[in-house]
Swiss-Prot record:
SUPFAM superfamilies attached to this UniProt entry: Protein kinase-like (PK-like), Winged helix' DNA-binding domain
Gene this protein is translated from: RIO2
Residues annotated as catalytic: 229
Residues annotated to bind ATP: 123
Family: Belongs to the protein kinase superfamily. RIO-type Ser/Thr kinase family.
Gene3D superfamilies associated with the record: Phosphorylase Kinase, domain 1 (3.30.200.20), Transferase(Phosphotransferase) domain 1 (1.10.510.10), Winged helix-like DNA-binding domain superfamily/Winged helix DNA-binding domain (1.10.10.10)
Additional free-text comment from the UniProt record: Present with 10300 molecules/cell in log phase SD medium.
Location in the cell: Cytoplasm; Nucleus
Catalytic reaction list: L-seryl-[protein] + ATP = O-phospho-L-seryl-[protein] + ADP + H(+); L-threonyl-[protein] + ATP = O-phospho-L-threonyl-[protein] + ADP + H(+)
Domain Protein kinase: 95-257
Subunit structure: Component of a late pre-40S ribosomal particle, composed of the 40S ribosomal proteins and the non-ribosomal factors DIM1, DIM2, ENP1, HRR25, LTV1, NOB1, RIO2 and TSR1.
Protein name: Serine/threonine-protein kinase RIO2
Known function: Required for the final endonucleolytic cleavage of 20S pre-rRNA at site D in the cytoplasm, converting it into the mature 18S rRNA. Involved in normal export of the pre-40S particles from the nucleus to the cytoplasm. No longer associates with pre-40S subunits in RPS19 disruptions, suggesting it acts after the ribosomal protein in 18S rRNA maturation.
Amino acid sequence: MKLDTSHMRYLTTDDFRVLQAVEQGSRSHEVVPTPLIHQISGMRSQSGTNRAISDLAKLSLISKMRNVKYDGYRLTYNGIDYLALKTMLNRDTVYSVGNTIGVGKESDIYKVSDKNGNPRVMKIHRLGRTSFHSVRNNRDYLKKSNQGANWMHLSRLAANKEYQFMSMLYSKGFKVPEPFDNSRHIVVMELIEGYPMRRLRKHKNIPKLYSDLMCFIVDLANSGLIHCDFNEFNIMIKDKLEDENDCGFVVIDFPQCISIQHQDADYYFQRDVDCIRRFFKKKLKYEPKPDSSMLDTEGFGDGYKYAYPDFKRDVKRTDNLDELVQASGFSKKHPGDRGLETAVESMRNAVYNSDDDMSNDEAEEENGEGDYSEEDEYYDSELDNESSEDDSEDAQEEENERIIEALSSGVENLKMDKLGNYILE
């Protein structure tokens, strides 16, 4: 779905009042009745409301539902885009929208700027659009949740959750983008001048980078959180270092974080570790071994006692960030978060297979190097189409390209299921 802001400047105050009324009515109605829209908007005349509704429908900001017993409308993704952008424009967070940086698993990424021309990144969450794993999996977890198909609401929750995670982590000194604003399903954050680690083939100090990444996983866990998607696609390598103490990377994509008290915390922690081990072994030919003769346990890899972190051995809680942001697994959630947790749970497991785990060196030798099936958070058109070493990886990449091509060319010709999910033939 492309972001089209060309009509935004022509919308009147009344148009936005009616659009916001549809949004508010959507909290209790799948299809918002026209009389309710008029009532919520506070418009003086019904004719003024009807005019605004007509204009908004022509711009596909709202849509009229067929085969319903009453005259009503529902908000579209274009409509909620406009509402979020309008809010950020009023806050002077976003002034202009630039080109698409890429298409992620459940989001679109744009380059934007503020009123002073400072470049930023705008991430638009679009849960339920099209799963990069399979459309069927998304439908499965929808049926299990029994929460309905209010993907806009889930996208809003995911964006708010990511903004909370980033704000808390940034304030604690973790290497994450600086968050600037959040409105509805959109998060605006710092633009990182760099590239995804998946493109990394040479580095001046590979052992240090490896150790720093492993320490990030442990430090995050010591603060109460596990990333759950810590891989080469969600790690940005910076073009320039700020100082000699700069580790040279920034971690992105946080909606799926869980608490270290989660019942599967050990599994997700080890999976994050294994993703880094596989990448360094496969692409950088770096595979450190444990060295019992070394006494230093402040890092991992060459020159240290341990080759990689272990959840039970290395994680020692020093902070309660999971409690502060109410991360999954810490406590019982408000009913409104259950649908989000179900959706994000599917995202966590969409492209991973438990057979790929490397709990020890023997398992690694038995299972081989493992597959690279995670998707890139930023699909850069300049990335080289590398030859895959595994047939399943080739198939996954081909599916991703097909989805991205369909999304980039528009969704007008795509069919939709009853829940509003786009289906690729």
